[in-house]
């Protein structure tokens, strides 16, 4: 551009509309040769068209601090919607408008075309489940969660039409950070997960827009504010005991190592009692609220069928959680290494139901019942553990909506992201009973996506050899694994089931525990 004074006095030429192909060649703009003109003055920054969502946050990366201070503060967006057009053509049997990554997942899922056509909404539900931006592992997990950019809600599908527009509401809720876990010997796909709550709102009556906006406002008010790290640390200081656990406990022996913490056995110096100690590095915990939740629940809820919380200490950023030690290990070792008879299974189910009846009576849902979270004493005692995922329910919120637990043990209403109540624990107990029969939960050998589809659509899973089970046991399983939540038994009801009257004494579990330990030694 020339610095000629004459050009400086000329007004700028009107802007010329150019097609994108002119710039795509990479050469000089051919039109510029015909106009010895200065470019149009730049539009003031405040008036630039910009993306409503991205530009609010991009200033921290591109703009200077000075500019930030000059601009009025703008709060992050709330209640914004990300619309995804996903349809299902009943004639061709194909989804339309599906995100590319979901399409790739579906292609390798082993969900047949017939299954997709039979229940396309269930397919979308399980694809949403695999949205890795919302799937979280619990604390002490061995592998850090992967993050991916996905829409945060599952499109709702209207199968009556060939294509529908689905509105996905992205909420800034408590469950969005990477999440806390327990050490489990199973493959990654059997580990506990935690995902954001996504429930489609009940549509407002036609023409009554105020009802919908009022409901949203009410939901916002009910949502509890997210605690800052400092608030969490302050809360922890009010919960824990003062002192140094290294002085109160001795003979530390490591029995487990996770990505963000370690589990030891140790001995109480004063009492000579053997305990289990979780040492958790809080700096590595992106979901610290779950730790507070677990401590508070275990502190308040004392029951013979729940692993006893003993104490907790905070030393710098290290949290020490001291718990009762059960030397028999987890029920997983027994179900994978030995064969249980029906009377032994009945004994374990009875003890777990006693724990669940107590929890549910205290308005607590465990949400992660599986053999990994049932610990055994050498004398055969059976106790539930791992309350990082438990949820309290109130009269105002009698149903939960967060997808949480472990995929193969999940109730259908959780997989399909419906509101749920305490009976999700009963379904998981039924799956655990099948574990005790077959050594693993149903669908474990299926592709995980297809397994979720089958859980969502099949109802009660089929047993490998149902004829080998007594009618009374099959009836107990059917009561636990009833697809209709209203017909599914409660913990209180199932404690009266005739199957539990077959239970052997708990001491009958001791030979199984010893056999499992021996088998595991041989496998090393």
Curated annotation (Swiss-Prot):
EC number annotated for this UniProt entry: 2.7.11.1
What is reported on the regulation of this protein's activity? Answer: Activated by binding small G proteins. Binding of GTP-bound CDC42 or RAC1 to the autoregulatory region releases monomers from the autoinhibited dimer, enables phosphorylation of Thr-402 and allows the kinase domain to adopt an active structure. Following caspase cleavage, autophosphorylated PAK-2p34 is constitutively active.
Q: Where is this region: Disordered?
A: 1-81, 142-190, 204-228
**Stored InterPro entries:** CRIB_dom, CRIB_dom_sf, Kinase-like_dom_sf, PAK3-like, PAK_BD, Prot_kinase_dom, Protein_kinase_ATP_BS, Ser/Thr_kinase_AS
Q: Does the keyword NAD apply?
A: no
GO MF entries: ATP binding; identical protein binding; protein kinase activity; protein kinase binding; protein serine kinase activity; protein serine/threonine kinase activity; protein tyrosine kinase activator activity; small GTPase binding
| List of catalytic residues | 368 (proton acceptor)
PTM field: Full-length PAK2 is autophosphorylated when activated by CDC42/p21. Following cleavage, both peptides, PAK-2p27 and PAK-2p34, become highly autophosphorylated. Autophosphorylation of PAK-2p27 can occur in the absence of any effectors and is dependent on phosphorylation of Thr-402, because PAK-2p27 is acting as an exogenous substrate.
Q: Where is this motif: Nuclear localization signal?
A: 245-251
Q: Where is the composition biased (Basic and acidic residues)?
A: 67-81
| An example Gene Ontology CC term for this record | postsynaptic density
Q: Where does ATP bind?
A: 255-263, 278
Q: Write down which residues bear the modification named Phosphoserine.
A: 2, 20, 55, 58-59, 64, 141, 152, 197
* Biased amino acid composition, Acidic residues: 169-178
By its UniProt entry, which Pfam families does this protein fall under? PBD (PF00786), Pkinase (PF00069)
Which family does the similarity line name?
A: Belongs to the protein kinase superfamily. STE Ser/Thr protein kinase family. STE20 subfamily.
The job of this chain, per UniProt, is described as:
Serine/threonine protein kinase that plays a role in a variety of different signaling pathways including cytoskeleton regulation, cell motility, cell cycle progression, apoptosis or proliferation. Acts as a downstream effector of the small GTPases CDC42 and RAC1. Activation by the binding of active CDC42 and RAC1 results in a conformational change and a subsequent autophosphorylation on several serine and/or threonine residues. Full-length PAK2 stimulates cell survival and cell growth.
Protein's name in the database: Serine/threonine-protein kinase PAK 2
Q: Which organism is it from?
A: Rattus norvegicus (Rat)
Gene name of the record: Pak2
């Amino acid at each position: 551009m020339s610095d000629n004074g004459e050009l400086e006095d000329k007004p700028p030429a009107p802007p010329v509309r150019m097609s994108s192909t002119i710039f795509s060649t990479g050469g000089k703009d051919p039109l510029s040769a015909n106009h010895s003109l200065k470019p149009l003055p730049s539009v003031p920054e405040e008036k630039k068209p910009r993306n409503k969502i991205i530009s609010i946050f991009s200033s921290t990366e591109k703009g200077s601090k000075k500019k930030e201070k000059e601009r009025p503060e703008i709060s992050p967006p709330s209640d914004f919607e990300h619309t995804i057009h996903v349809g299902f053509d009943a004639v061709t049997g194909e989804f339309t408008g599906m995100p590319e990554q979901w399409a790739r997942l579906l292609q390798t899922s082993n969900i047949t075309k017939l299954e997709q056509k039979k229940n396309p909404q269930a397919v979308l539900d399980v694809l949403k489940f695999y949205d890795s931006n919302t799937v979280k592992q619990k604390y002490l997990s061995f592998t850090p969660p992967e993050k991916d950019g996905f829409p945060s809600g599952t499109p709702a599908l209207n199968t009556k039409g060939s294509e529908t527009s689905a509105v996905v509401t992205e909420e800034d809720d408590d469950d969005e950070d990477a999440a806390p876990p327990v050490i489990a010997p199973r493959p990654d796909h059997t580990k506990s997960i935690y995902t954001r709550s996504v429930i489609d709102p009940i549509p407002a009556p036609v023409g009554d827009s105020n009802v919908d906006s009022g409901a949203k406002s009410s939901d916002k008010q009910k949502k509890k504010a997210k605690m800052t790290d400092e608030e969490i640390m302050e809360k922890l200081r009010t919960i824990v005991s003062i002192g140094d656990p290294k002085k109160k406990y001795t003979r530390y022996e490591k029995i487990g190592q996770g990505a963000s913490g370690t589990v030891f056995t140790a001995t109480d110096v004063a009492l000579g009692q053997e305990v289990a100690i979780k040492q958790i590095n809080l700096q590595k915990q992106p979901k610290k609220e779950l730790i507070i939740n677990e401590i508070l629940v275990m502190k308040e809820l004392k029951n013979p069928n729940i692993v006893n919380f003993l104490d907790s200490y905070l030393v710098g950023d290290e949290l020490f959680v001291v718990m009762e030690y059960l030397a028999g290990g987890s029920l997983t070792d027994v179900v994978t290494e030995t064969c249980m008879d029906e009377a032994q299974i009945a004994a374990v189910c009875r003890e777990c139901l006693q724990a669940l009846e107590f929890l549910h009576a205290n308005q607590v849902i465990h949400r992660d019942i599986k053999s990994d979270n049932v610990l055994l004493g050498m004398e055969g005692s059976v106790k539930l553990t791992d309350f990082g995922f438990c949820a309290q329910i109130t009269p105002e919120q009698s149903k939960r909506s967060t997808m949480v637990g472990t995929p193969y043990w999940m109730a259908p209403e959780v997989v399909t992201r419906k509101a749920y109540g305490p009976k999700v624990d009963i379904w998981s107990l039924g799956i655990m009973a099948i574990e005790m029969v077959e050594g693993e939960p149903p669908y474990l050998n299926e592709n995980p996506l297809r397994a979720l589809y089958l859980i969502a659509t099949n109802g009660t899973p089929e047993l490998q050899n149902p004829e080998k089970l007594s009618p009374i046991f099959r009836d107990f399983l059917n009561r636990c694994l009833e697809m209709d939540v209203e017909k599914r038994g409660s913990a209180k009801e199932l404690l009266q089931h005739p199957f539990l009257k077959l239970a052997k004494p708990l001491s009958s579990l001791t030979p199984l525990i010893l056999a499992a330990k021996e088998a595991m030694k041989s496998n090393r």
